[in-house]
Amino acid sequence: MEIEIIPECLQFKKPAGTSRGVYTTRQIYLIKACHNNTIGWGECAPLPDLSQDALSQDEYLTLLQRFTCEIEMTRQIPYEELRPYPSMLMGLESAMRHLHSGSWHHYPHTKFSKAESGIPINGLVWMGNIEEMSQRMQQKLKEGYTCIKLKIGALDFDDELQLVKKIRRQYSSTDVEIRVDANGGFQPGDGCMKKLEQLAQLNVHSIEQPIKQNQLDDLAKICQNSPIPIALDEELIGVNSLSEKKELLQYVRPQYIVLKPSLHGGFYGAEEWINEARKLNIKWWVTSALESNIGLNAIAQWTALQSNDQYSMAQGLGTGLLFVRNFDEVPLKLAK
């Protein structure tokens, strides 16, 4: 077996506003695994200032090369060694799965892989000023999305609340589901709870990460008392061992967790999160993290497997149309 690392810099069609700033380019590292004339592709896609393994390019390549050499010799992924490097693990897992299946359809027995059913996805409204976000929101609604996700917490909350009200004036909660993601933009205390109450009056489905991570006492109180369900996202980053995952979920007791394999332990670690969440009746959905079509396809294939082709809620897998060049050879079609 031979494994090659290919750095790629993707260009966004339009600047992508996130809680960590505005992206115009995206650095990724493709994994090309070859064995007996069969090729498997994977994608390592760390996010600057967010991923636990967001290292300098030289550091990242050096470490990734070490792991690929080990896999070439042993034909085994060193899962325990890779726990602190989730984006590397996801890319290596994807390449091995592609190699072993011999197809972009990593799990060919699922209805999704057989093109017999799709995966419902939400329409994501990127950050911007209020006018930009309003236009993007209306476009998603025109495109027929029945689940809209709004990034909030960066602008004036009253203005952000008006966006939610605008949807509710047009559509009831049975017609359009609204999710909001605060990216830690609220402060613990009465002010946070008041905002949650205002969102609850508009039948918001859930809010992701209302306060910044590593405030577990405050977060547990919010999860217990919030009038709308709480979903954890950034809080899961860096929680690597199985015992830590159990402890976090048992203490905080969120209603949902949002899983991004590139950030939350690769597929191996994300499956641990799912197993522990199920024991506590915590629901989950999967979200991509600005991967190209190679990574997005791997996440979608895995999501179909974990969900057994049954979806009680929309997944966050609609980011494949962001890049100028996006590996169109991957047989992945994005629609509402």
Regions found by a protein language model. Name each.
Residues M1-I178, N183-G185, D190, E197-A200, ...:
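N-terminal capping/lid subdomain adjacent to the active-site entrance of alpha/beta enzymes
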Residues E8-Q11, M127, L236, L290, ...:
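Short, solvent-exposed coil/turn elements at secondary-structure transition points
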Residues I28, P227, P254, S312-A314:
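Active-site lining segments that contact anionic ligands and/or coordinate catalytic metals
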Residues C44, Q209, L317:
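Active-site donor-binding loop signature of nucleotide-sugar glycosyltransferases
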Residues L99-H100, T303-Q306:
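Generic structural signal for hydrophobic core residues of well-folded globular domains
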Residues I121, V125, I152, A231, ...:
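Long, contiguous hydrophobic alpha-helical segments, chiefly transmembrane helices and signal peptides
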Residues L155-T303, L322-L334:
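Catalytic core of soluble alpha/beta enzymes
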Residues S307-L321:
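Short helix/strand-capping turn motifs
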